[in-house]
Amino acid sequence: QAQNHDDVYDDHFKKEKVDYKKILSPADLIELKQGYEEGIDATIDNNATTKEIRYLAKAYKKSGDKRCITAAENGVVYLLKAQYKNGGWPQFYPDFSNYRSEITYNDNAMINALSVLLDVIEGVNDLDVINEIYISYCNVAIQRGISCILKTQLKQGKQLTAWCAQYDAKTLKPADARTFELKSISGGESVGIVRFLMRLQNPGIEIKKAVTSAVTWFNKVKITGYAYEDIKADNVAGKDRVVIPKPGSTIWARFYDIKNNEPFFCGRDGVKKKTVAEIELERRIGYAWYIQAPEKLLNEDYPAWVAKWINK
């Protein structure tokens, strides 16, 4: 995959997700490099850029090839440049068209960026090879990012809940993304945010409150006794995805109404539906409408964090 002039990476090539194991032909390499001249598709979506930074740092450790560490450090510089002054990150930079300018927690985009910078500061996960001159800049970016996270945690009345997947970059209000991704409280992205906050050393009162409030919300909205599974079906896809009773199983919706916590679902028409069965097949089987990601957070990670920082 080619690094563009912004020292960052796209996550697609020829309109398909990048296959990192694919050996590119000479023609592919030429097309790839030409397409990256302007860097308009530079992104942190789908692990792009952060994944490459980590890969290059690890490659430098193994090979000693200075091109790898130079490219990795250029990627870190890109992350620092792309951050808004309010602490958020857009999904794409410098392309701010449509929803690309929004502060993006979706698919852990902003959390992935923060995690790379925190690894640089702490010298862990192979990022100890990044030049120490970047640490002070990363520290500033981390503090800004934490501030943004705290400011964007949603409230119901006076009670903190969790986070929307994306926010308006200027107003910090919840925002829509694609037509089937309406503003909501996210049962998915909020997990990554909480895990990042729990990673911070010596958390202050605000961070502790943010974490405990989000966990309270996760427990409040969990759906017990059901699972979300693929089944064989007589349709063009040969399958469907449905909610079925399953004792002992716990799931969470991807989208909850900001005011009343009711799960909702959207097809490409952008119209809210109360059940996943009401949206078209293509979206029904093509998106993670229910998840189990909060389960480990609640059962393992959070109790360990409480023992370390709350009950010490």
Locate the predicted segments by residue.
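Long, hydrophobic/aromatic-enriched structural stretches that serve as scaffold segments
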Residues: L24-K62
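Terminal, non-catalytic domain-edge segments
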Residues: D119-S147, K170-E181, I185-K312
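Solvent-exposed loop and edge beta-strand segments that line ligand/cofactor-binding
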Residues: Q34-A48, S97-M110, Y134, D176-S190
